[in-house]
A protein has these predicted regions:
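Formylglycine-dependent sulfatase
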Residues: 1-352, 356, 360-396
Length: 396
């Protein structure tokens, strides 16, 4: 997946996950941030809703945050430069903690709307596909004060690996512009320690805030008598750095960036199981098809992980793949190998290898050590074959 791609523009006519369920007589509803580009996936939804911000972009609520946002946005509007990805609209603070009710922020309103839709389905008894796209814990880390108060700042520490990996190439560096765009953040260099602790605190608060909203929706499923016939998948669209390797935000080939949470609840299967099997986002589509008893479209590249719900320890994928920028990574049960290819020569211009058995935090790049030459050749062949197959994939 390329950042900020569009389904309608890049793969027009493709049968998306919600469209497939819609074609099979499910009522498909999108609430909140489901597609990155609102309005994308035309024909997939019978309803497509996002809450309007009540104050400014980013839904700031404190008077100070609103003032800072408006002043910076006015500066940007007067900027004669080109308004592109390198000159995005100025943003307000990276975090705030006003004493407001949960519903004041967008995620509270998204949860409320989801409950309303579930109440409708209790009455109609129609099969439904409800996508609830909560925004947190994306930046800015804005959450009601009570969620900040759940954590004592004195207990929050910087990560033990608050440094760039030893022997890693410059291509692996992350400038975390997404955070630098916010008010008060340095345009270059590391965060002051006090600011770094506040950012971590804000992330924790937002996780607890969105956890409460998810709980409201799940409680409604139970109360309305829908839980015993509803499959629930909770997943995030990416991981997040909280100072590991000196990084913040995401968009890195180091594993903290792409590693996302995934929890599945199927009423007729045992709960409480965990697996170390490797799965990918593309596996969710065929998994839901299998669990719902639908045939899977032929264009899918993923593999249903439904069997793991019964036997989480069975042999599974030997490797999965992800990319960030021009970096391509293969992840196995023991190693992560990344290459950046020089387009002129077709050869790697930089590479990384991490042995997760002894270095799960990816602190030491061992790609140039001679004892790993044979392993790298094998991983490289698998990675190149994957990229070739992916880029030449034909969608019927």
């Amino acid at each position: 997946v390329i950042w900020n791609c569009s389904q309608d523009k890049d793969v027009p006519g493709i049968v998306s996950l919600p469209m497939h369920f819609k074609n099979n007589n499910y009522q498909t509803i999108s609430l909140g941030k489901v597609y990155n580009n609102f309005g994308d996936g035309k024909g997939s939804w019978i309803k497509n809703w996002r809450p309007a911000t009540t104050t400014t972009n980013w839904d700031y609520q404190s008077e100070e945050s609103i003032r800072v946002f408006e002043e910076r946005n006015e500066e940007w509007l007067k900027d004669p430069g080109i308004h592109d990805n390198n000159n995005l609209p100025k943003r307000g603070p990276a975090y705030e903690s006003p004493d407001v009710p949960d519903i004041t922020y967008e995620d509270g309103r998204i949860a409320n709307r989801a409950i309303e839709e579930l109440q409708h389905f209790q009455d109609s008894r129609e099969p439904f596909f409800l996508a609830v796209g909560f925004k947190k814990p994306h930046l800015p880390f804005n959450a009601p004060r009570k969620y900040w108060d759940m954590y004592d700042k004195k207990d929050i520490q910087l990560p033990s690996n608050y440094f760039f990996p030893k022997d890693a190439p410059g291509a692996a560096r992350l400038n975390w512009d997404e955070l630098r765009f916010f008010a008060g953040m340095p345009s270059a260099g590391p965060l002051p320690d006090t600011t770094a602790i506040n950012i971590i605190h804000g992330y924790y608060a937002c996780v607890s805030y969105v956890d409460a909203q998810i709980g409201l929706v799940l409680n409604a499923l139970e109360t309305l008598g829908l839980a015993q016939n509803t499959i629930v998948i909770l997943w995030g669209d990416h991981g997040w750095f909280l100072g590991e390797h000196g990084f913040w935000t995401k968009q890195s080939n180091l594993e903290k960036g792409p590693h996302a949470p995934l929890i599945v609840k199927v009423p007729w299967k045992s709960g409480g199981l965990q697996t170390k099997a490797l799965v990918e986002f593309v596996d969710i589509y065929p998994t839901l098809c299998e669990l719902a008893g639908l045939s899977a479209p032929v264009h899918l590249q993923g593999k249903s992980f439904a069997p793991l719900l019964d036997n989480p320890d069975q042999p599974w994928k030997e490797a999965i793949f992800y990319r960030a920028g021009t970096g391509e990574t293969i992840l196995t049960g023991t190693h992560a190998y990344t290459e950046w290819i020089n387009p002129g020569t077709g050869q790697p211009s930089a590479r990384m290898l991490y042995d997760h058995r002894v270095d799960p935090e990816e602190n030491v790049n061992v790609a140039d050590r001679p004892e790993h030459k044979k392993l790298i050749k094998s991983l490289q062949e698998q990675l190149h074959q994957h990229v070739k197959t992916r880029d030449n994939f034909f969608i019927p």
